[in-house]
A protein has these predicted regions:
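Conserved PLP-enzyme active-site core in the AAT-like
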Residues: 8-174
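Conserved PLP-binding active-site segment in aminotransferase class I/II-type PLP enzymes
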Residues: 1-2
Length: 174
C-alpha cells in the first residue's frame, strides 16, 4: 500500500532494532514511556529493563483502560507505545482514543503493527504518529532474512535524527 501521510521511512536490521531505536530517539534520562503491561517479550525486556538502566522509567498500564493511561501520562512522558494487537495476549486497545490522549499532551503515539500486516492497515488514519514493524515476514517469511521499518508520519526532525544519530550510533543499518 502507499504510505499516505508518511514523511519518512527508515529501514532497520530487525523489528526490535526499529522499536529500540525509535524509543531511544524519543526518550532521554528522566523521561518515561507509557506502554501496555502486555508486550512481546523482547519489547517488555527493552522497556522494563534496558531503558530503565539508561534512566527511562517504564509506566506499564492497561491500555484498554483510558483513565489509567491518562493518569500515567505526565510532563516527563516521552511517548505512548502500543502494539496494535498485543503479543501474545491478543488484546486490542482503542487506537484513536490513545492518539487523542497522546496528542492532548503533545507526545507521539508509537504503534508496533507487526501483528497486522502494515500493507493492509492504515495506522496513521487512526492517529498513530510513528509506526514500527517487523518486516521479516515480508522480506522472506521464514526468518532467513530479517528487517524492520520505522514509518514517520510527521514528527518534527524525527526521521533526520533516526538517520543521523540512531543509525550511526547504534548500527542497526539495513
Amino acid at each position: 500500500r502507499e504510505l499516505k501521510g508518511a514523511t519518512g521511512v527508515v529501514a532497520m536490521s530487525s523489528g526490535m532494532a526499529a522499536i529500540s531505536n525509535t524509543l531511544f530517539c524519543l526518550s532521554a534520562t528522566g523521561k518515561n514511556i507509557v506502554s501496555s503491561r502486555h508486550l512481546f517479550g523482547n519489547t517488555y525486556a527493552l522497556i522494563g529493563g534496558t531503558m530503565l538502566r539508561f534512566g527511562v522509567k517504564p509506566k506499564l498500564v492497561d491500555l484498554t483502560n483510558l483513565e489509567e493511561v491518562e493518569a500515567a501520562v505526565d510532563n516527563n512522558t516521552a511517548c505512548i507505545f502500543m502494539e496494535i494487537i498485543t503479543n501474545p495476549q491478543m488484546e486490542v486497545a482503542d487506537i484513536a482514543a490513545l492518539a487523542d490522549i497522546a496528542h492532548s499532551k503533545n507526545i507521539p503515539l508509537v504503534a508496533d503493527t507487526t501483528m497486522i500486516p502494515f500493507t493492509h492497515f492504515d495506522a496513521h488514519a487512526l492517529g498513530v504518529d510513528i509506526e514500527v514493524v517487523s518486516s521479516t515476514k515480508y522480506i522472506s517469511g521464514g526468518a532467513t532474512s530479517i528487517g524492520g521499518l520505522v514509518i514517520d508520519y510527521g514528527m518534527p526532525n524525527f526521521t533526520k535524527r533516526m538517520r543521523q544519530e540512531m543509525l550511526m550510533n547504534f548500527g542497526a543499518y539495513m
